[in-house]
Amino acid sequence: MYYIGIDISKFKHDCVVIDNSGEIITPSCSFTNDSEGFMQLKILLDSLDAETRIGLESTGHYGMNLKLFLESNNFSFMEFNPLLINRFVKSKSLRKTKSDSIDCMMIAHYLMTVEYKPYPALLYHTEKLKSLTRFRDSLIRLRTRQLVELTNILDKVFPEFKSFFGGKFSVTALYILSNYSSPEKISNMNSKSYDALRKVSKGKFSTVNFAKLKQLAKNTVGNTEDYLLQEMQIVLELYSQLDSKVDETEYSIEECISTINPPMLSVPGIGIESAAVILAEFGDFSKFKNASQMLSFAGLEPGYFQSGTSETTGRMVKHGSSYLRYALMNCAQTVVNYEPTFAMFYAKKRSEGKPHRVALSHVVKKLLRVIYTLQTKNLAYDSNFVR
């Protein structure tokens, strides 16, 4: 048996091969993160005359192309949390020496100590979903930032506007700002303008509100200098562009999810976007022995400390993916809203005196057990089997 440790970096990767006894078969060597380097690695792997096990750290997008290359050439591999490798290194030596050659050696040695669980064959879909869901999150953050900028500008141009709409930027509010770009134009809106607003608001924008808004615009204390109006239009255009890109990304996510069709979608309250994040961040559910391991992977388990007679439990450890924790907590809330069994469980925890977020974290634990069962056994959700 040969154990291959690969240390991932941006422009090159380092690799070492050892045998069962830890003896070095191929000393640490580097190969570039391109087709030439990958072929160099393939030649090395093909030359080995026994079964091989490959281990590498989970280091974001730098290793994605290498993983796809290994999968396409029928080489299995196992990914490790960098924190586990770091702790393993510290357990072996007190010296603070670090290099890529040492790292790949430590990965190979750590690979020898654990049960080998190769990365799933659904790598392409998993990586695609992870990239799309994280990109969607980035777009939404950028889009939200434009609304903050818009608020700052409106505080100068038309400070009465946002409070008139309840402090929110509704579809109607954004339509008015995009089509009537100054308080003066808003104050001069006519009956045709109102007809358009009624269509946009689906009949919710009344004539009384229309008259009030025009009056506010007429008497505003805002500063309507050209440069401020120009800034506002640019921000509105950016928001519109980002909004359309979010829609495009969500469509791509839906296409990918429809190909996989995960059983967790049968749980009331779990939508496509949340299911996509959960599936992308967890990857292969079969690599977890139980739902408790999934909870630990997500960083949602409480910290625990015991020494002598002292024993304490603390807050969530919050290791792992913040995207995953956010998605699970959001799912827990919607499942409570749509599924009576989970609603009763949440109410029970609240009746025990637990705060909202703590009670919701208990719902997450219960939900994860359900998701784990559905995904590993390929079952549809049935509330009769949930206790």
Show which residues each predicted segment covers:
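A detector of single, family-specific signature residues
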Residues: 1-387
